[in-house]
Amino acid sequence: MSFRKYALITGSNSGLGFGIATRLLQFYQPRLQDEPEVFTVILTCRSREKAEDACRRLKEFFPDRKIRLEYVLLDLSNMASVEAAVQDIATRFPKLDFVYLNAGAWDLEGIQWLKAIFSTLINPIQALTHPTFYKETAGRVSNDSLGYIFESNVFGHFYLKNRLAELKVLRSSTKVVLTSSLVAEKKSLDFEDLQCFHGEQPYQSSKRLLDVLHYAELEKGLPFEQYLVHPGLCTTNMYETFLGPILVMCAKLGFYICRLLGSPWHTISPYVAAFAFLWTALHATKEDQSIKWGAAVTRFGHERVLSTPVELILPSEQEKALEYMTKLYQEWKKKLVS
């Protein structure tokens, strides 16, 4: 049916991805059993068990609504899995109206506690918005011999969207939403080491590269609409995996304090953070593609969307990043597509 809409959300079994799925279903799915289904949400997860669990929880969350959920298996750190997902999506779905490229990885090695304590006491908003006390695992390489964080956060999605565009699953009206970050800082990205094999901040590097690529692609021209959005600062499963429940509670307390002190970016809840991603689907126009949008809140938690400054990106940086990614894409496409 031509009126049916399809939304693909990567990394949707928990955290922000699950929040985005919840928001979309709340808005689109009918309550009455005799109303037609017009919206399909396609979840991507690494395993069948996680996907089926996410579908079950979403259905339990909306007991009085007609829910249409599908899932695709996808591991962004495995390029063979990415190509398999491309083929699965192209075979099963005629088009995609919304594509949320949300899944990603963060590899935390530890916390510099003295630095964390003193920086938080001196300037809590700065310390908990742009933290400098996390120590990331440097130099991790995937089984594809790519930078693990680079592949998981940038290249896997770059390959996915370009292949889907080639197969005409993405149309001119499709809205592709990239998940950026507040920590996408210029200093973290080395253009001589775009995969961050040698850098100490692979996560920040990957998010800055994502920003650079977005503007490079807009400049060149895309066959679909593409938006750059970040979730503010919310506590997801990545926090819980590395910090544990007690430290996550402490982090949430710190985030609430920052919010009361006036920080707009401490969204805390993935559901609240997902508001900006829903707004993009419903209200963003082509003119909004040039702005980096962010999920934000008032002191008392009222949701809003704010534009976010992006540090200067030079034309030469855009050109170098896009040329590198395009070449890598062609290399992997040749390997994976018979």
From Swiss-Prot:
The keyword Lipid metabolism applies. The active site is at S180 (proton donor), Y203 (proton donor), K207 (lowers pka of active site tyr). SUPFAM superfamilies: NAD(P)-binding Rossmann-fold domains (SSF51735). Its EC number is 1.1.1.270. Pathway: Steroid biosynthesis; zymosterol biosynthesis; zymosterol from lanosterol: step 5/6; Steroid metabolism; ergosterol biosynthesis. NADP(+) binds at L16, T44, K50, D75, Y203, K207, T236. GO terms for molecular function: 3-beta-hydroxysteroid 3-dehydrogenase (NADP+) activity. Transmembrane segments: none annotated. It is an enzyme of class 1 (oxidoreductase). Keywords: Lipid biosynthesis, Lipid metabolism, NADP, Oxidoreductase, Steroid biosynthesis. Pfam families: adh_short. One of its GO terms (cellular component) is endoplasmic reticulum membrane. GO terms for biological process: ergosterol biosynthetic process. It catalyses: 3-dehydro-4alpha-methylzymosterol + NADPH + H(+) = 4alpha-methylzymosterol + NADP(+). Belongs to the short-chain dehydrogenases/reductases (SDR) family. ERG27 subfamily. Heterotetramer of erg25, erg26, erg27 and erg28. Erg28 acts as a scaffold to tether erg27 and other 4,4-demethylation-related enzymes, forming a demethylation enzyme complex, in the endoplasmic reticulum. 3-keto-steroid reductase; part of the third module of ergosterol biosynthesis pathway that includes by the late steps of the pathway. The third module or late pathway involves the ergosterol synthesis itself through consecutive reactions that mainly occur in the endoplasmic reticulum (ER) membrane. Firstly, the squalene synthase erg9 catalyzes the condensation of 2 farnesyl pyrophosphate moieties to form squalene, which is the precursor of all steroids. In Aspergillus, the biosynthesis pathway of the sterol precursors leading to the prevalent sterol ergosterol differs from yeast. The ringsystem of lanosterol in S.cerevisiae is firstly demethylised in three enzymatic steps leading to the intermediate zymosterol and secondly a methyl group is added to zymosterol by the sterol 24-C-methyltransferase to form fecosterol. In Aspergillus, lanosterol is firstly transmethylated by the sterol 24-C-methyltransferase leading to the intermediate eburicol and secondly demethylated in three steps to form fecosterol. This is 3-keto-steroid reductase erg27. It comes from Schizosaccharomyces pombe (strain 972 / ATCC 24843) (Fission yeast).
